[in-house]
Amino acid sequence: MYYFYSPEMFAPYQWGLERDVSYAYMPYNSFYYGDYINSLPYAYIPQNYEVQMKADDRGSWTPFSWVEKYAYAFSGPYNKAEVALTFDDGPDLEFTPKILDKLKQHNVKATFFLLGENAEKFPNIVKRIANEGHVIGNHTYSHPNLAKVNEDEYRNQIIKTEEILNRLAGYAPKFIRPPYGEILENQLKWATEQNFMIVQWSVDTVDWKGVSADTITNNVLGNSFPGSVILQHSTPGGHLQGSVDALDKIIPQLKTKGARFVTLPSMFQTSKERK
């Protein structure tokens, strides 16, 4: 039997409505089957809450037990009216500064998952992110699919980036987000043993498609719930103006609904540093 779990949300679902939004594998707003969990590729929820899964879909499922076994999460506590804005792939010289300006305007702190190669190119932007009170996370050095690299390359991607960010931001980030949301169990095990925490997302704005501010706003407002981790991007150039502009709508409207914007260390009650 499949079960749909949906905590009280800031904005109720419109049952049966398809939105341009996708999810990482996540523990809330998902369909469960035994020890496995799967989220729909789009937020299409039938009115009777039932989904017919094909047998071959099982190959793409992630064991839900990983969330319990390792320092691994998709969203925060659903009993707190908190949401976290997160931005991947930066920094750059065009959109990251615009995002920082918007966050400062709205007095909101966020978490930026940075690529090591981009941090090397734009060190002053890394320093600005840190100096303005935002949290920096590790998004690997060159954005590989970690599920397709060997163990040595995986560790090198993380440690090399950590060294760069430590030098520029003044601390070694605790938080990792794997590119594409892809990670293997042995990689999770190593990261947990090294005192990292891996955080995916529960709401994907799909801003990388170059969609409009209104589409992004509808994606976020229609799918956010207490504990939501919202995924946006601060790079690549040429596609993200809609994501920047959407912040002027997302932030005040979620605040009006009672949401507090927090960083990931605050949401998970831990340090921003790997110690």
From Swiss-Prot:
InterPro entries: Glyco_hydro/deAcase_b/a-brl, NODB_dom, PGN_GlcNAc_Dac, Polysacc_deacetylase_ArnD
CDD domains in UniProt: CE4_NodB_like_6s_7s (cd10917)
GO biological process: carbohydrate metabolic process
Record PTM text: Hydroxylated on Pro-179. Hydroxylation alters the active site and enhances significantly deacetylase activity, probably by creating a more favorable environment for transition-state stabilization. It might be autocatalytic.
pH dependence: Optimum pH is 6.0.
Thermal response of activity: Optimum temperature is 50 degrees Celsius.
The entry's keywords: Hydrolase, Hydroxylation, Metal-binding, Zinc
Protein name per UniProt: Peptidoglycan-N-acetylglucosamine deacetylase BC_1960
Organism, scientific name: Bacillus cereus (strain ATCC 14579 / DSM 31 / CCUG 7414 / JCM 2152 / NBRC 15305 / NCIMB 9373 / NCTC 2599 / NRRL B-3711)
Lineage of source species: Bacteria, Bacillati, Bacillota, Bacilli, Bacillales
